[in-house]
Amino acid sequence: CRVPNWWKKKYSSVKINVNIGEKKPSLLGFESILSAQPSLIVNGHALTKKEISELLKMEEGLGWLKGQWVEINHNKLQQLLEQMEKYDGTISLKDALTKTYISDEDNVDVDLGVQISNGKWLRETLGQLKDPSKIRNKAKPKYLKATLRPYQKNGYNWLNQMNDLGFGACLADDMGLGKTIQVISFLEKMYENNKESHVLLIVPASLLGNWSKEIDKFAPRMTYHILHGKTNILDEDCFATITTYGMALRMECLQERVWDCLILDEAQAIKNPATKQTRAIKKIPSQMRIAMTGTPIENDLSNLWSLFDFLNKGLLGSATDFKNYTKKVQAYPEYITKLKMMVSPFILRRLKTDKSIISDLPDKMEITEHV
């Protein structure tokens, strides 16, 4: 029958839902292959292929299906079926996240009535990363000489989970909340599991002494050496190599080994993607990457892109794609919301002002002195 004018004012009741990542993939990482299961939804009801065929056989207008009236539009229905074919099968985790939150295709997909939802495994995994208290406790390293606060234990669990999943991680806690001890705990666990592993820490020159002191204090069994100044030869027998940003720029030999973990302290040092230092560091191959910074965004959103280009390359697209995306942020506030949803599983940030983090700290006091 003909569609009446009052019906045309209603929002289309036909759309596609693509369920991604229902089960855990066999291999983990951003290139993990997830299942993609599209289904056609009419007024909240999923249709079988047989029922879809029945819809196509009906005349355009209103049709009676599953005890309700639905709009039959052959052209739109055919478009939806073509979209179903496009999504049916598998998709990489990186593409799944991009399509869910930040893809340039999202406007097209929405117009065609495509809704992407996370399946059970993907939903639970991202939920754990956004709230580390949901992650199952990882056993504390046997020889760690430190007592972790509850939020630090959550951070330790989170770093281990990120490593298990093959994701890069940004530990962005406020200064003073113990980013260093959380990372040392993670490294001590890695050392405990495999003493043949090799990790590279790149830190400001002013922090070399502090890292050495903290490792000696909290993980005295861990073998490490400092690569700085005249000491410019890698020690193959050491678990950890600690060097500076300046040395990382000069020593191309750091790029000749695939490190088990690459860690940047004060990672805002790579905020400018165009510098030689940033480009050199991003060339260092590694299985896992950690960025430590209290300021993941210092000046503008391009800082965030450079950080994620190091941590999880391709997640935020190319520099040009991301620049075009950020232009929409001021005009459309929902775009910044999408971006936050996109990066939040990979950034762990706790604040000293949050009493749920440290309840025994006194309130912050600010004193203004006029000079």
For the regions a protein language model found, what residue spans apply to each?
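Accessory nucleic-acid engagement/destabilization modules that flank
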Residues: C1-Q128
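A structural signal for short hydrophobic/aromatic patches embedded in well-ordered alpha helices
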Residues: L55, L80, G155-Y156, L339
